[in-house]
Amino acid sequence: MSWQQYVDEQLTGAGLSQGAILGANDGGVWAKSSGINITKPEGDGIAALFKNPAEVFAKGALIGGVKYMGIKGDPQSIYGKKGATGCVLVRTGQAIIVGIYDDKVQPGSAALIVEKLGDYLRDNGY
């Protein structure tokens, strides 16, 4: 399965409004859904958050021009919120999965979608 298929089928196909997969080391965009534009500085910032996840509480997470307030930050998962929408970021060995949800999706459901893909990629060496 290609990285784009993971985004299309496992993230947006599962109900998230937007999704992307980035390189864990450099934050480069490997695949993304339409409607999300993660700039190089944003990708760098996302990758850097996983080096010091507690910073998400002070700095938030900037994704596609939207700043999300940090509500969870650990070396494996970062969650953010902005009003009724939010983001779930999950780091595997080689990738960072980005899931964006809108007000039609419960935060717990969004987290389950992204964490499940993260577990699958980790189990398969990514």
Curated annotation (Swiss-Prot):
Organism: Dictyostelium discoideum
Residues passing through the membrane, by range: none
Gene Ontology molecular function terms on file: actin binding; actin monomer binding; myosin I heavy chain binding
Pfam families: Profilin (PF00235)
Family per record: Belongs to the profilin family.
The protein's assembly and partners: Occurs in many kinds of cells as a complex with monomeric actin in a 1:1 ratio.
Function of the molecule: Binds to actin and affects the structure of the cytoskeleton. At high concentrations, profilin prevents the polymerization of actin, whereas it enhances it at low concentrations. By binding to PIP2, it inhibits the formation of IP3 and DG.
Name under which the protein is recorded: Profilin-1
Sections of the chain in a coiled coil: none
Compartments, record wording: Cytoplasm, Cytoskeleton
CDD domains in UniProt: PROF (cd00148)
Designated gene of the protein: proA
Origin superkingdom: Eukaryota
Keywords on record: Actin-binding, Cytoplasm, Cytoskeleton
Principal place of residence: cytoplasm
Entries under PANTHER family matching the protein: PROFILIN
Keyword Cell inner membrane: no
Keyword Cytoplasm found: yes
Single biological process term from Gene Ontology: positive regulation of actin filament polymerization
GO cellular component: cell cortex; cytoskeleton; extracellular matrix
